[in-house]
Amino acid sequence: MSRTIVVDHLARIEGHAGITVVLGGDGVERVDFNVTEGIRLFEGLVCGRHCIDVPAIVSRICAICSHGHTITALSALEQALHVTVSAQTRTLRDLAYQGANIESHALHVFCLALPDLLGHPSVVSLAGANPAAVGMALRLKKLGNTIQEIVGGRAVHPVNYVIGGFGRLPSTDDLLQLKAALEAGLNDCAAALALLRTIALPAFVNEPVRCAALIPRDEAFFFGDAVRLSDGFEVPVDKYLTLTNERAVAHSHAKFSLHDGRSYMVGALARLSLHGDRIQGAARDAWNAVGLTLPSTNIVANNLAQFVELVYSVEHALEIVTALLAQGIADEPPVRVEMRAGEGTAATEVPRGTLFHRYVLDADGCVVAADVITPTAQNFSNVEDQLRAAVRDGAGETDEVLRSRLEIVARAYDPCVSCSVHAIRVL
């Protein structure tokens, strides 16, 4: 006799999704991660539009990831237009990515995931029991927003990034403000570490995690030109379709990805598993203190990996700002752009994993084809594999216990469902 476990609405994630699991006499018969978010046709929206309009449009794919979508789109368009940006522009974009990482990871680790690990139903309940922890989390989130606002013009849906550079460059006063805020942020990271090092991860998950991430370019941890999987497969960014292999499934408004017939995960856990040797300083100390062991067979460890990256981003952002103050901001205009036909593909590591943007332009600079593949869409197949692992030995557990397990595992990926349903799909 079969038994069905249903999570109608997965709380504490971005967007709308649910879970259906069918258990039978022979184990887990079916697992569906049901993405019910309304379909949003961004790739169709940009076709026919001039390339100058594209970054502002695709930033609306997601508010939390808006800077990542904007900069990844700019990088792809600059490749198509044969535009090479300055070292200063690359540095400032790197700084913006640190801000995005701080904001997103602070929100997820402390407000969305931590209630699970401390036995609270919500961040509101957690705030009542531990207001200092939630206050610290919100200060870190504000720090990330401040960085993005200073570099991108707005914390959400930036207006300052343009093809070839920036509309306005940060002032010395802006950088001094950031430096003080980042120094305070390191103190908040230390307070957060004191809390996280006391938390034990749930033991019901024990399943190997196949990881994928960009191979970092020089010291830029979130930028690269090729993707590596933990089983050794490597692919240049412009051949990304050989990795993602998107497919439609009946139970989801988003597409799912498989590589070589198997799922993989992207995100903080994948980045540290593949390239964690680049993490040093306070972030390495935090890694050791929380007891993060990689490679991990516990997907919930992604929450700890996100915290390690958060510390890295605060520390690295402070290094960038200190260097910019020492050398000064060069008053450089954006690179001059001449419209031409071309094709460009770019990938960056946004908080939830590897993000791909591809655009084909005509001779006037208008978009004739577009493709965006988000981290969460790549993760969906792996989510289902890990959900299966979480309940396969749970025949003797109550429905309530199994629902809790399913929610904890799904939330560990920090899914951004609005990003995942960006694509055109024929229904």
Named regions from a protein language model:
Residues 352, 357-359, 369:
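A translation/RNA-centric and nucleic-acid-associated enzymatic feature enriched
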Residues 365:
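Active-site catalytic microenvironments in core metabolic enzymes, especially phosphate/sugar-handling
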